[in-house]
UniProtKB/Swiss-Prot annotation:
Chief location of this protein within or outside the cell: host cell
Comp. bias (Polar residues): 89-98, 143-153
Record has Metal-binding as a keyword: yes
Record function comment: Protects the virus against cell antiviral state by blocking host interferon signaling. Mechanistically, targets host phosphorylated STAT1 (phospho-STAT1) for degradation, thereby inhibiting the interferon alpha signaling pathway. Plays a role in the inhibition of host apoptosis. Interacts with and down-regulates the expression of host TXNL1. In turn, inhibits TXNL1-induced apoptosis through the BCL2-BAX-caspase 3 pathway. Inhibits host apoptosis also by negatively regulating host CacyBP/SIP. Promotes viral replication by activating the extracellular signal-regulated kinase (ERK) pathway.
Location of the region described as Disordered in the Swiss-Prot/TrEMBL record: 30-104, 126-180
Keyword vocabulary terms for this entry: Host cytoplasm, Host nucleus, Host-virus interaction, Inhibition of host innate immune response by virus, Inhibition of host MDA5 by virus, Inhibition of host RLR pathway by virus, Interferon antiviral system evasion, Metal-binding, Viral immunoevasion, Zinc
Keyword Ribosomal protein: no
Short name of any one Pfam family annotated for the protein: Soyouz_module
Protein name per UniProt: Non-structural protein V
Organism: Newcastle disease virus (strain Ulster/2C) (NDV)
Positions with a binding annotation for Zn(2+) 2: 200, 212, 214, 217
Residues reported in the UniProt entry to bind Zn(2+) 1: 177, 196, 221, 224
Subcellular locations according to the entry: Host cytoplasm; Host nucleus
Amino acid sequence: MATFTDAEIDELFETSGTVIDSIITAQGKPVETVGRSAIPRGKTKALSSAWEKHGSVQSPASQDTPDRQDRSDKQLSTPEQVTPHDSPPATSTDQPPTQAADEAGDTQLKTGASNSLLSMLDKLSNKSSNAKKGPMVKPPGRASSTSDSTAGESTKPRKQSRETAEPGQGRPWKPGHRREHSISWTMGGVTTISWCNPSCSPIRAEPRQYSCTCGSCPATCRLCASDDVYDGGDITEGK
């Protein structure tokens, strides 16, 4: 049975630790994924620690003497221990076809998403502008009445008769008489005067009798038939 000194055992432990770190930090072919990281969750910290430890171990290992390096080469005879630990793991610069296709697909997806977003923003801006300057919408009830009244005015012209209001009056009238009264207060008491005016005459605040201007009002009516004959002008209490 072979025996080892303490220095050889320490060197063996150090070399095996370096090989284990090299195996851990070696990067194989990444798993082809779409939209996901190739590194499993929870492994990033372990890989970073292994790289740091590997870098710190390389510096003292490079200072060993040539004879110690020869002994370590003899001891490491297993196939998995032949992995070089002096150089960082090689990474391929060429992208596999699947990865290039994935990147092209991602670019197309981003472009399509951008176009969809722009079209959506255009639609929203058009809707907001139409809402601000949209056409005037007439109420349904008022629209029908307006159209009916307009059609009635166009097809049935208004009949101008004497029953319509004169320019100086605000209500319609018919040929005839209108009874008017004047009340006054004096020292002797209250005096009341009544008379008739044609319907076509204007209505004034002062007591006055007018003559017919339309030619259709009668000379007298049943109310003024018994009145004194009056020739027009201002009405006073003596008359």
